[in-house]
Amino acid sequence: KHDNGVGALCTPIFQTSTFEFESVQQGGARFAGQEEGYIYSRLGNPSLTQVEEKLAALEGGEAALATASGMGAISSALWSSVEAGDEIVASDTLYGCTFALLNHGMSKFGVGVKFVDFADLAAVKAALTEKTKVVYLETPCNPTLKVVDIAEVAKIAHEYNKNIRVIVDNTFCSPYIQQPLSLGADVVVHSATKYINGHGDVIAGFVISDAEFIGKCRMFGLKDMTGAVMSPFNAFLIARGLKTLDIRMERHSANAMKVARFLHDHPAIDKVYYPGL
C-alpha cells in the first residue's frame, strides 16, 4: 500500500509535470540526489510510484519502472544493459516490434544480436561469448505460444557469466501465472496494455528487477534514451485493472482451454498451438 498523504483508498491522479520545493536548498538537494522526493514527472510521479510498487510486489522484484508502452519498457531495459561492442542472445520467436528493435535497431549502435531457438538449450549455450551482456526471451512466445524453460536458460547464462542479464517478457502470462524472477531471471518486462491493465483502454509497460538496475533504467534508459513515461491517468487506470487481475486470468485461461480443445477436435484444423493441450 502506497501512502498517498491524504488517506484516499484509491491513489489520486497527480496530473502535474513539476513539483514544488520548500526552499532553494531542498531543490538543490533533490537535483543532487541527496534527498528523496519528486522533481519532474519524467523522473517520478506519485501516481506512477503506487502502481510501480504493486508490479514489483506481484513479480517478486525489489522495484519497478512504469513506461508509456511495452516497447518503452523493452527499449529502456535494453539500452540500460548494453553498449557498442556488446552482444545479445535472443529467442528466434519474438513479438514483431521486439524483433525489429533487435534485428535492425541495435545494429545501428554497434550491438550484435544472435537469434537462437531457445528450445535447444545446447544452442543457447553455444551462442554465448565473452561479449554477451543480455539473454532475451519471451515465454510463452508471441505469437506461437512456444514455451521456454526460464530456469534452465538462466542457469546456462549465469554459469557462463554471472553478470549476463537474463530479461524475460512476461506479458502473455502476467505475474498471476508466472514469476520469472523466482525462476532465475534478472529482469522482467511487460506490455501492460494486455492482461495487466485488461480493459483495452491503456498503452503501457513495466520493467521489474532489483533496485539498482531499475534506478539505472529510470535515470538513463527512460530519462535520457527513450523518454517513454507513463501518464498519471494511465497509472490510475492500471491500478484499477490490477484489482481484477486474478479473476480475469482464471477466466482467460479457462476460456482459452475450451477454445483450444474445440479446435483440436475440429476436422478442419490441422494443428493447434496451445501449451495447455
Show the residue positions of the predicted features.
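N-terminal glycine-rich, Lys/His-bearing helix-loop that initiates the first secondary-structure elements
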Residues: 1-35
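A generic secondary-structure signal marking the coil-to-beta-strand transition
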Residues: 9-13, 36, 63, 234, ...
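Residues in well-ordered beta-strands of folded domains
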Residues: 14-16, 41, 273
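A general marker of short, structured functional hotspots
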Residues: 17, 27, 34-39, 91, ...
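Conserved N-terminal alpha-helix of the aminotransferase class I/II PLP-enzyme fold
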Residues: 23-75, 97-104
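Conserved PLP-enzyme active-site core in the AAT-like
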Residues: 64-268, 273
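Active-site loops and adjacent core secondary-structure elements that bind or stabilize anionic groups
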Residues: 275-277
